[in-house]
Amino acid sequence: MNPISIFSVVISVICAVQAEFKVYWEVPSFLCSKRFNINVTQVLTSHKILVNQGESFNGDKIVMFYENQLGKYPYIDSNKVEINGGILQVADLLKHLKVAKDNITNLVPNPNFNGVGVIDWESWLPTWDFNWDKMKVYRKKSIDLVKSKHPEWPSHRVENVAKEEWEKSAKEWMVKTLKLAQELRPNAVWCYYSFPDCYNYSRKDEPSPLACIRKVLVENDRISWLWKQSTAICPSIHIQESHITKYSMSQRVWWIDARLREAVRLSMYHRNIPIYPYINYILPGTNQIVPVMDFKRTLGQIASLGLEGAILWGSSYHLFSESQCKITFDYVKNVIAPTVATVVLNTNRCSQLICKGRGNCIWPAEPFSSWKYLLDPKMPVFKPMKIICKCKHYLGRYCEIPK
């Protein structure tokens, strides 16, 4: 058999193995198909990217519930109007769960749905201290509530009780909503969007300041109930325009690495549950596409940490015109599809060759550069001494020991 034939056989065998690295397309690209006959899905599916039937935003592969789509989510809007009670302590949780049950069964009609379910609640945070900027209103309203009941208490006691009541209520709301979703659609994995956060927005010319600070680690551990109840973790590593203009490439690598490693750390609270980071192809608040090398590197970083995949999110805002749809189509064809194909191929190759197909490869001594191995389209050589395996149902450096 000549070398070309051997290469073809190797490729076919590897591709026959079910990909351990899954990329979900969460973009309403049906708008391009219906309005302008620009079909992005054919390119995506031919490169094993998971797309909902009919190119819908919510469907058989992935669903996302925004704040107004799931139950009676309490929040305070931009005009200071209190919606559904405004703050958690006075909102009706039972009514919320009753409505949420109908929402879930309607949006996810298949009781055997086995995709990814995402809850996107962003108006407030369960950690009291992280409700800053616009979210400070929740702390103020919580303090006012305690003050109205106990006007004689000193301010420090009022704030301590307000914090305790807020965090207790947040836990109850988030856990019971997750449990409901898991009971109704038990074959799916469920997560809250953008949890955990790392709040690593400083700009320094070394890795450590871009890592999660100790305060964040401590507070993320305090909400261990969230990681224990979740069956997936879905942090956001969206590339921002400010990252491109203010950060060097090395700093962008460090920023993403810190956020991913915090997700990995917290996943251990619940038997190493799968991690699906949210990534983007359009810079938020702009019409600019993510630079090609940044997109490639981001996907490579996710895979090089042994994670299960990624969710590629996009808004209908960028699909209203024919020119916008053409930009999306070209980026999918020339950047997203070939990058995903290469990363999936190399992830599977390394898994089969080094981890016996029982886990994914990690390069612990090369935390900021190992992504390059998985972006190499020329069948890179994987050196076992540089690799440890993130194993599924096995133990040992190379997943050689059954649990």
UniProtKB/Swiss-Prot annotation:
Signal peptide residue numbers: 1-19
Keyword Secreted among UniProt keywords: yes
Residues carrying covalently attached carbohydrate according to the record: 39, 103, 200
Enzyme nomenclature, EC number: 3.2.1.35
Tissue specificity annotation: Expressed by the venom gland.
Key words of the record: Disulfide bond, EGF-like domain, Glycoprotein, Glycosidase, Hydrolase, Secreted, Signal
An annotated GO BP: carbohydrate metabolic process
Catalytic activity: Random hydrolysis of (1->4)-linkages between N-acetyl-beta-D-glucosamine and D-glucuronate residues in hyaluronate
GO MF assignments: hyalurononglucosaminidase activity
Enzyme class: hydrolase
Cytoplasm is among the record's keywords: no
Localization (cell): Secreted
Function: Hydrolyzes high molecular weight hyaluronic acid to produce small oligosaccharides. Is an important component of the venom, since anti-hyaluronidase serum effectively neutralizes the lethal effet of the venom injected into mice. It may act by increasing the diffusion of other venom proteins by degrading the extracellular matrix.
Family listed: Belongs to the glycosyl hydrolase 56 family.
This protein's name: Hyaluronidase 2
Organism: Tityus serrulatus (Brazilian scorpion)
